[in-house]
Amino acid sequence: MELASAHLHKGQVPWGGLLLTASLLASWSPATTAEVTIEAVPPQVAEDNNVLLLVHNLPLALGAFAWYKGNTTAIDKEIARFVPNSNMNFTGQAYSGREIIYSNGSLLFQMITMKDMGVYTLDMTDENYRRTQATVRFHVHPILLKPNITSNNSNPVEGDDSVSLTCDSYTDPDNINYLWSRNGESLSEGDRLKLSEGNRTLTLLNVTRNDTGPYVCETRNPVSVNRSDPFSLNIIYGPDTPIISPSDIYLHPGSNLNLSCHAASNPPAQYFWLINEKPHASSQELFIPNITTNNSGTYTCFVNNSVTGLSRTTVKNITVLEPVTQPFLQVTNTTVKELDSVTLTCLSNDIGANIQWLFNSQSLQLTERMTLSQNNSILRIDPIKREDAGEYQCEISNPVSVRRSNSIKLDIIFDPTQGGLSDGAIAGIVIGVVAGVALIAGLAYFLYSRKSGGGSDQRDLTEHKPSTSNHNLAPSDNSPNKVDDVAYTVLNFNSQQPNRPTSAPSSPRATETVYSEVKKK
C-alpha cells in the first residue's frame, strides 16, 4: 500500500498542519556523512492535532526503512515500510490509518491521541543488509477544559471558619499547573493562605470579609491555558457598630428630624429605633416632622444579625433649642475720662447661651486692662484709654441661632496737651531736671567763690523740702488740677567778711536763698 497517497478522513487534518509538513519536507536535504537524527514537530502535541517525525541526514543508499511503535523492531509493532528502489509503501500490523510515510524517511501522525504518546523507532537497512536504528519521543497533552472552583464551606463566618477552594480541571491533574488569583492579583502562600502540593487547593484560614473575592483558578499544560469563572465567597460577618447620620445633635423647633442608621453586616442587619429607651420603629431610617422641645432626648439605633446572633447599638443625644432672643447692652457711662474705668453688661434671658464681645463690628481682642465675668456677660475696662473709644456690642448664640445686641459708642475724654508719656519717661525727665539744677547750682557757687576771693568766703549749700506754710508754691490739694511737689533744692549763699577783732560786734551775714522747683503734674 502506498501510504504517501492515502486519503485522509474528512475534517481530521488541519490545513495548517499539512502546510507545515510540506514546508518541512521541502526544506529537508540529505547529508551523506552526518548521523541520522529525528525531530518531533512539535515535541509537545495537543490532542487531536498532528505531529511530524522529521528525519535528518537519511542515507541515500538504503534498501528499505521502516517505522515501529516503541523502542523495538518487533514485527507486530511495525507501522509502515518504504522501499526506495521501487518507491513502494507497505503497512504493518501497528498501522492505524492515520500515518503517512514519506520517501525522505519522515512519518506524519494525524489526529494524535493520548495513546500515541511515546517512543518511535526508525529502522534502516542498507544495500548490504546492515541495519541501524534511530529513535524519537513526543508527548501528547489534552486540550484543557474550563476549570471549576468548588468550596467546602458555602457560608463561612468571619473570624471563626476556614475555607478550602479546589480547582477541578476535568483532566489528569498530574500534568497540570494551577495558579490562583483574587481580585486580579496573583496569590501565594502567606499567614492565612495555604496551598496544597501542586497548588490545586487553596485554603483560607480564619476568613475575613476581605476574603470575599472573586477568585479565579488558571490551569496550564504545555499546549493550552484555561481559566475558571470568577468565584466569590459568601462570608457572614457583623453587624459592626452602627453609625447614625447626620451628625447634627441640635435642632430648632419646627424643623424635621430625619435620622439614618447604617451598620456593615452580611446578611443585612435588622434595624430598630428606641427613643428615650422606649421602642419606636423597626426601620433603618427615623423621621419625625415639626419637632418641639419635647422631642429632645436619647435616640438609640439597635442592629442585629440573625445568622451570627450578634447585636450592636449606638446612642445619639438630640437637643431641640429655641432660637436666642436679642440681648441688650448697657454701660455705666458712655462718656468716660481717660484712666477711669467703665463696665459694660450684656443682658439676656437665654440661659446657657454663649456670649462674645465685639468692638467696631470685629471680635474684641482682650488686653491686660480688660476683664470678663465668669459667663462673659460683664466686660470691665480699667483703666480706659483713648484707643478704647468706639462701638461695642455683645453677641449671644446657641447651636441653632445667633443674635447681636444694640450698639453702644464709648467716648473717651482726655487732655490734648498730655503727651501720654509713660511712667518711666516721666521719671527720667524728673531725674534729668534735678541733675541739671544741681549742676547749675554748683557752677554758680564755683564762680561766686572765685569772685569773692577764693577760700575766704563760706558757702552754705543745703537742700530742703519747705513746708507749704513757708513756700506754698503749688496749688491747693483740693484743686481739680492737682500738682504734686516733687522736690525743692535750696541754695543758701552766706557772704563772710574778713576776720575782725573779737571785741567788735559781728555784723549779720548776708544770706541769699535760691529755690529751684521741679513739679510733676
Curated annotation (Swiss-Prot):
Required for homophilic binding: region residues: 39-142
Region of interest (Interaction with FLNA), ranges: 447-521
Domain of life of the source: Eukaryota
Residues modified by glycosylation: 71, 89, 104, 148, 152, 199, 206, 210, 226, 258, 290, 294, 304, 317, 333, 375
Residue ranges of the region described as Required for interaction with PTPN11 and PTPN6 and for control of phosphorylation level: 484-521
Effect seen on changing residue 518 to A: Impairs interaction with PTPN11 and PTPN6. Doesn't affect phosphorylation
Annotated membrane topology: Single-pass type I membrane protein
Residues annotated as domain Ig-like C2-type: 147-234, 239-319, 323-411
Protein family (similarity comment): Belongs to the immunoglobulin superfamily. CEA family.
Summary of subunit composition and partner proteins: (Microbial infection) Interacts with MHV S1 spike glycoprotein.
Summary of the function given for this chain in its UniProt record: (Microbial infection) In case of murine coronavirus (MHV) infection, serves as receptor for MHV S1 spike glycoprotein.
Name by which UniProt lists this protein: Cell adhesion molecule CEACAM1
